[in-house]
Amino acid sequence: MWSPVFLRYVLDPSKLKEFEHYGKLWFPLVEKFGGKHHGYFLPSEGASNIALALFSFPSLAEYEQYRQKSFNDPACLAAFKYAEETKCFISYERTFFRPVFSA
C-alpha cells in the first residue's frame, strides 16, 4: 500500500510565482525516485500564504531512501538552492497518512 506524504507550506505571498516554479521542479524528481506526485495546491481563495503538496511512495522505507538520495542528487540540490535563494516559503511541515477507502 502506498504511503501518502502531505506537505503544508507557509509561503511568502509576494513570491507565489517563485513557489509555483519550485513546486514544478519536484514533479520529475519525486517520480525519478519511485514516487507519485499528486500535485501542489496553491492559494486561490482564503489564506494567501498556505500551499499544500501531496505525493506518495510505495512504502515509508522507500520514501526514506528518496530523502537520503535527494541530498546527493544534483537536480534536487538545485531545487533546494532555488528555494533558499528565492525564500519562496517560510516553513513547511511534513505529515504521513494512511489511506482509508470505502468497503
PLM regions: where:
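Short, solvent-exposed loop/turn elements at beta->coil junctions and helix N-caps
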Residues: 40-43
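Short acidic/polar alpha-helix capping motifs at helix-coil junctions
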Residues: 3, 16-17, 29
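An amphipathic, aromatic/His-enriched active-site/gating alpha helix that lines ligand/cofactor pockets
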Residues: 21-38, 56-94
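Short, surface-exposed ligand-recognition loops at beta-strand->loop->(often short) alpha-helix junctions
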Residues: 10-21
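Active-site-flanking beta-strand signature of metal-NTP-handling nucleotidyl enzymes
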Residues: 2-9, 52
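Short acidic/glycine-enriched loop/turn segments that link adjacent beta-strands
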Residues: 46-49
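Short beta-strand-to-loop capping motifs
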Residues: 8-12, 55-59
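Short, low-order "capping/linker" segments at domain edges
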Residues: 92-103
